[in-house]
Amino acid sequence: MEEVLEAAEKIRSMEVRGAARIARFAAETLMKFAEKASDEKFDEEMRFAAETLLNTRPTAVSLYNAINYVMRYSGESVEEKRQSVIRRAREFINWVETAQRKIGEIGEKRIKDGYTVMTHCNSSAALSVIKKAHENGKRVEVIATESRPRWQGHLTVKQLREAGIEVTLIVDSAVRYFINEVDCVVVGADTITANGALINKIGTSQIALAAKEARVPFMVAAETYKFSPKTLFGELVVIEERDAREVAPEEILKLGVKVRNPAFDVTPRDYIDVIITEIGAIPPEMAYIVITERLGYAGIEEEEITLNSRHFD
């Protein structure tokens, strides 16, 4: 169990970050744990491992979907169950890998030669769209936000430069100043709700608002495992608030200053032009169909929907 606790801490501390990376890491962790879990308490130990991982990042539905997918294992004997976990984990990991590639192929069609693209945070799905356009010979420049307070934008600019793409780094508060120099915005997603709203890195909704005002297309790159089945049943997405020390140094905190540090915000579907998924470019209104048909949650057993629900109240 020690390796599960270590993996959970890596997710909680954001040593492993990004919705896709978190989902894949969780699937890999469950697969490795299944190989070592005892025969006597296999189901009990697997469930404890799943709940431990689920309790780390409440907003990232990719984590929930990854764990729910792997935990739908089957088998009569313990060995059959063990092999089922391993097989399902590998299937999910393959889903992560192929989805990102397909999103790049579909999304790059909306990036024209000579475009300047704005992006926020560090989304592997969003960057796959930009990188694919560049690989296909299109001249693309990127304006990337710093994405405070965790500075994910620094990762983005490094990855773009490594790919040979011209990039300008700006502070988050300068988005509206630069929005008229942009041809489109491409961001990733932590969660897509049943009504088509986007939950993503704090600051995303302000970019969407600025883009709407400037009539700049706002596109979301999101794998279908980032769509939230829980919102189909009326549950609201919990917005994680992180440590005040990410925002302010101790000399400020010791003055008794109250600090709020939400990690995510909500962008209404009215501000989203299109969601680029591995199954196609869809309007946000189609999120309900993705959840019920692609994820198969229309009539699924209640146990699978409410796994570890006490952590999401």
UniProtKB/Swiss-Prot annotation:
UniProt keyword list: Carbohydrate metabolism, Isomerase
UniProt miscellaneous comment: Reaction proceeds via a cis-phosphoenolate intermediate.
Role description: Catalyzes the isomerization of ribose 1,5-bisphosphate (R15P) to ribulose 1,5-bisphosphate (RuBP), the CO(2) acceptor and substrate for RubisCO. Functions in an archaeal AMP degradation pathway, together with AMP phosphorylase and RubisCO.
InterPro entries cross-referenced by the UniProt entry: IF-2B-related (IPR000649), IF_2B-like_C (IPR042529), Initiation_fac_2B_a/b/d (IPR011559), M1Pi_N (IPR027363), NagB/RpiA_transferase-like (IPR037171), R15Pi (IPR005250)
Domain of life of the organism encoding this protein: Archaea
Cross-referenced HAMAP family: R15P_isomerase (MF_02230)
Catalytic function, reaction form: alpha-D-ribose 1,5-bisphosphate = D-ribulose 1,5-bisphosphate
Protein name: Ribose 1,5-bisphosphate isomerase
EC number: 5.3.1.29
Alphabetized NCBIfam families for the sequence: eIF-2B_rel, ribulose_e2b2
Transmembrane regions listed in the UniProt entry: none
Active site residues according to the UniProt entry: C121 (proton acceptor), D190 (proton donor)
GO MF term set: ribose 1,5-bisphosphate isomerase activity; S-methyl-5-thioribose-1-phosphate isomerase activity
Amino-acid positions noted as binding substrate in the UniProt annotation, renumbered to this chain: R17, G18, A19, A20, R57, N200, K201, K226
Family as reported in the entry's similarity comment: Belongs to the eIF-2B alpha/beta/delta subunits family. R15P isomerase subfamily.
GO annotation terms (biological process): L-methionine salvage from methylthioadenosine; pentose catabolic process
